UniProtKB/Swiss-Prot annotation:
Keywords: Aspartyl protease, Capsid protein, Host-virus interaction, Hydrolase, Lipoprotein, Metal-binding, Myristate, Phosphoprotein, Protease, Repeat, Viral budding, Viral budding via the host ESCRT complexes, Viral matrix protein, Viral nucleoprotein, Viral release from host cell, Virion, Zinc, Zinc-finger
Originating organism: Bovine leukemia virus (isolate Australian) (BLV)
Catalytic center residues: 452 (protease)
Name of this chain's protein: Gag-Pro polyprotein
Peptidase A2 domain ranges (all copies): 447-525
Lipid attachment, kind N-myristoyl glycine: 2
Entry keyword annotation includes Cytoplasm: no
InterPro entries noted in UniProt: D_retro_matrix, Gag_p24_C, Peptidase_A2_cat, Peptidase_aspartic_dom_sf, Primate_lentivir_Gag_pol-like, Retropepsins, Retrov_capsid_C, Retrov_capsid_N
Pfam families hit by this protein: Gag_p19 (PF02228), Gag_p24 (PF00607), Gag_p24_C (PF19317), RVP (PF00077), zf-CCHC (PF00098)
Length: 571
């Protein structure tokens, strides 16, 4: 900041007294140099070391500085003594004596005359950073805040545009609005009292003080600008909206309510709040609510849709347990299970005593009452169906393979069970899929898709999407070679579920068929769902042999030809 040293005071002086000395040094003629500020700091160190006490205005007058040792420091002390003595006034001889306070309250007293003013120059970015660093921990409108800004103004003689830039750099938007309101009221009040050199016919005070030859008029505007910081309206202490974060056990509705209250208290009237609420309602939500919003494609949606998606979310609570070790007698052993109640009489199956009928060794398992509801095989119960093998492997067992961590969106056991019970037709294995996303046509929220384990990626027809969906060309390797003009990549997330209640899977990118022919559920979705396809064996396999028919019709019975289902090639 020019020739000014750091505003942080050296050891042996209070911040208010140090700011007074710096402001008094600004009135030296010629203007102070870096050596003058160095001499001033060396004088404070010398005074604190020799006098064994901090420097104050009453104890550190001009006589306390030895002449010729610290340069122009005696002139600085004399100027400060003259200004403060004229401002306070000497008490009369008949003034009643008062008991001094137990401590000297800190006070930053303004310098009435700034001396010879510097020529105007715009602040550099480095100087703005220095000013902000000095007052970042000070309250706006406090004495140290005002005195620091006054010193910065003395060195640069800023115009109203420079002061507005400084205000935007050091103050929050709320404080900027409050300061502008206070400054406008102060200018209107002073204009009514006829400012010195102000001509209403020449424009506003802001316009006239910006002229190169403004002189005292610019100084009056600067004083009003500083005075506006003192008159900032007091407001209750509210939590900034950027620090409001949803707690792990806090409902999403309460979190959004706190966010809206903070924005209403912090932002002035007329400032749009909806973009901030829409952004922070996802960014500051807890991890579980963020996963819900990601799965449903509502990351950038309005807050109303997010409230509907997370309204029924509740944290998973665990029963707390406290382990306390207390010295005392030996604790009893583990609790033994209660003995089973003996049967009241003999078993009605074998007519022997000692066991219940459900535990009778002569009990045999009869045939199932009907065919298996999964594979339609009448020879076994549902619990023994071989199609449940995949479920046992997922749960983990003696014959389970190595556990493969899914790509993302791990599913619960109940969700996996609802996926494994979807029947597939043999001729054309298809499943109903529920889709949602910003690029889908409104009518394509539910569709029938072909299950193809040979397709590496899921494919959608182009007529399911809006006209201007984000796309990039894709080269697909098929049976006939590489296709470069038929498929595109949809560059946008899409949410997919096999049942309306979920679970929901988010796919980052999908192949789009521009010929509108394929709707394929590929391995990318099947692996995310941890799905497996089980084909049961035939109950009565076909027999190859002679038929019981007339000789003219004797022949061999063959299986019907396999269905010709075009398979999407590996990519």
């Amino acid at each position: 900041m020019g020739n000014s040293p750091s505003y942080n005071p050296p050891a042996g002086i209070s911040p208010s007294d140090w700011l007074n000395l710096l402001q008094s040094a600004q009135r030296l003629n010629p203007r102070p140099s870096p050596s003058d500020f160095t001499d001033l700091k060396n004088y404070i160190h010398w005074f604190h070391k020799t006098q064994k006490k901090p420097w104050t205005f009453t104890s550190g007058g001009p006589a306390s500085c030895p002449p010729g040792k610290f340069g122009r420091v005696p002139l600085v002390l004399a100027t400060l003594n003259e200004v403060l003595s004229n401002d306070e006034g000497a008490p009369g001889a008949s003034a009643p004596e008062e008991q001094p306070p137990p401590y000297d309250p800190p006070a930053v007293l303004p310098i009435i005359s700034e001396g010879n003013r510097n020529r105007h120059r715009a602040w550099a970015l480095r100087e703005l950073q220095d000013i902000k660093k000095e007052i970042e921990n000070k309250a706006p409108g406090s004495q140290v805040w005002i005195q620091t800004l006054r010193l910065a103004i003395l060195q640069a003689d800023p115009t109203p545009a420079d002061l507005e830039q400084l205000c935007q750099y050091i103050a929050s938007p709320v404080d900027q609005t409050a300061h502008m309101t206070s400054l406008t009221a102060a200018i209107a009040a002073e204009a009514a009292n006829t400012l010195q050199g102000f001509n209403p016919k020449m424009g506003t005070l802001t316009q006239q003080s910006a002229q190169p030859n403004a002189g005292d008029l610019r100084s009056q505007y600067q004083n009003l600008w500083l005075q506006a910081w003192k008159n900032l309206p007091t407001r209750p202490s509210v939590q900034p909206w950027s620090t409001i974060v949803q707690g792990p056990a806090e409902s999403y509705v309460e979190f959004v309510n706190r966010l809206q209250i903070s924005l209403a208290d912090n932002l002035p009237d007329g400032v749009p709040k909806e973009p901030i609420i829409d952004s922070l309602s996802y960014a500051n939500a807890n991890k579980e609510c963020q996963q819900i919003l990601q799965g449903r494609g509502l990351v950038a949606a309005p807050v109303g849709q997010k409230l509907q998606a997370c309204a029924h979310w509740a944290p998973k609570t665990k029963q707390p347990a406290i382990l306390v070790h207390t010295p005392g007698p030996k604790m009893p052993g583990p609790r033994q299970p209660a003995p089973k109640r003996p049967p009241p009489g003999p078993c009605y199956r074998c007519l022997k005593e000692g066991h219940w009928a459900r535990d009778c060794p002569t009990k045999t398992t009869g045939p199932p009452p009907g065919p298996c509801p999964i594979c339609k095989d009448p020879s076994h119960w549902k619990r023994d169906c071989p199609t449940l093998k995949s479920k046992k492997l997922i749960e983990g067992g003696p014959s389970a393979p190595q556990i493969i961590t899914p790509i993302t969106d791990s599913l619960s056991e109940a969700e996996l069970e609802c996926l494994l019970s979807i029947p597939l037709a043999r001729s054309r294995p298809s499943v109903a899929v529920y889709l949602s996303g910003p690029w889908l046509q409104p009518s394509q929220n539910q569709a029938l898709m072909l299950v193809d384990t040979g397709a590496e990626n899921t494919v959608l027809p182009q007529n399911w999407l809006v006209r201007d969906y984000p796309r990039t060309p894709a080269a697909v390797l098929g049976a006939g070679g590489i296709s470069r003009n038929r498929y595109n990549w949809l560059q946008g997330p899409l949410t997919l579920a096999l049942k309306p209640e979920g679970p929901f899977i988010t796919i980052p990118k999908i192949l789009v068929d521009t010929f509108d022919k394929w709707q394929i559920l590929g391995r990318d979705v099947l692996s995310r769902l941890q799905a497996s396809i089980s084909i049961p064996e035939e109950v009565h396999p076909p027999v190859v042999g002679v038929l019981d028919a007339p000789p003219s019709h004797i022949g061999l019975e063959h299986l019907p030809p396999p269905p010709e289902v075009p398979q999407f090639p590996l990519n």
